[in-house]
Amino acid sequence: MSDTLPLLLRAARGESVERPPVWMMRQAGRYMKIYRDLRDKYPSFRERSENPDLSYEISMQPFEAFQPDGVILFSDILTPLPGMGIDFDIIESKGPQIGDPIRSMEQVKALRPLNPAESMPFVGEVLGRLRKTVGNQAAVLGFVGAPWTLAAYVVEGKSSKNYAVIKAMAFREPELLHTLLNHFAESIANYLRYQIDSGAQVVQMFDSWAGQLSPADYDTFAAPYQKKVVDLVKQTHPDTPFVLYISGSAGVLERMARTGVDIISLDWTVDMAEACARLPEHIGVQGNVDPGLLFGTPDAIQARIDDTVRKARGRRHILNLGHGILPGTPEENGAAFFRSGKSVMDRIGTLA
């Protein structure tokens, strides 16, 4: 029975598979002409991600073009914020903008508990449609932002180079920040449960900005809330594989493994063999090709994929980039990544 399940789901569960499954973070996006054409027609990011017909169409674009082993919901980590009472927009070339940044306990106390089915029914609809369309040809992936990263956006009010505002809060008003982080942890766990109930078979949590923390501060402000999300989700959905990604994670890999996740998504600044040596054997790995390599030649992409898969041999491994694919990447190189990933065992031999 298990053989009929999607390759990525079987691999994520730790089953023996014929090759590492392959997908790409941000595989639906600006490097694809078909996406850019749709963006020109619908310039609002929130419309593209919150209109179920558009979100579904965009989610399917890379599947129809490249047949990756995973199809991820086209959305944003900030999508749940309005359901908690925090408005935002995403401005092309400027990134996320928070209308009223959270700076006081009064604002935190006024936040609503998240009811995803009520505030984001479009997410459930899209996930259900994706499952129905792709069947067992690919796994459907859901995702969320982790509490620290969501807090970084809503406290700073936008993307930041140095995170001075939230770090000031962390070190001057830690109780305020912990209250916010706890609210996000409970809400994000609810959101993930909703995604799984709607059709997501594997979920990934992005703590994009946790790499900006020292290891000690990671232990205080990021890891406990990552673990809380994982624990709450595992209580109700113990069999759904859970992936954690942090950009700039080389200094906290061992700490990430203690959060209860099943798979750690590595960025490209750590060698795959070194990461595997540092992580417990029961933890799977995802990654970790440098997205910048996709500006190179197909031969270079193939060689790096072969090296990465060879180094992860014997470990539960999902082939991916070490970050989202970059805007401006030649679309044919995206195709080369998938092609080389799917044929890797023909070149390096079996995984056994």
From Swiss-Prot:
Q: Name one GO molecular function term.
A: uroporphyrinogen decarboxylase activity
Which protein are we looking at? Uroporphyrinogen decarboxylase
Q: What is its EC number?
A: 4.1.1.37
- Single Gene Ontology BP term? protoporphyrinogen IX biosynthetic process
Answer yes or no on keyword Cytoplasm. yes
Looking up PANTHER family in the UniProt record yields: METHYLTETRAHYDROFOLATE:HOMOCYSTEINE METHYLTRANSFERASE RELATED, UROPORPHYRINOGEN DECARBOXYLASE
Marked site, Transition state stabilizer, at 76
Per the UniProt record, one Pfam family is URO-D
SUBUNIT field: Homodimer.
Pathway, per record:
Porphyrin-containing compound metabolism; protoporphyrin-IX biosynthesis; coproporphyrinogen-III from 5-aminolevulinate: step 4/4
Q: Provide the family line.
A: Belongs to the uroporphyrinogen decarboxylase family.
**CC terms in the record's Gene Ontology section:** cytoplasm
Where is the protein found, in the record's own terms?
A: Cytoplasm
Q: Which PROSITE patterns does the UniProt entry name for this protein?
A: UROD_1, UROD_2
| Coiled-coil annotated spans | none
Q: Where is it predominantly found?
A: cytoplasm
This molecule's function is given as:
Catalyzes the decarboxylation of four acetate groups of uroporphyrinogen-III to yield coproporphyrinogen-III.
Q: Does the keyword Transcription regulation apply?
A: no
Indicate the secretion signal residues: none
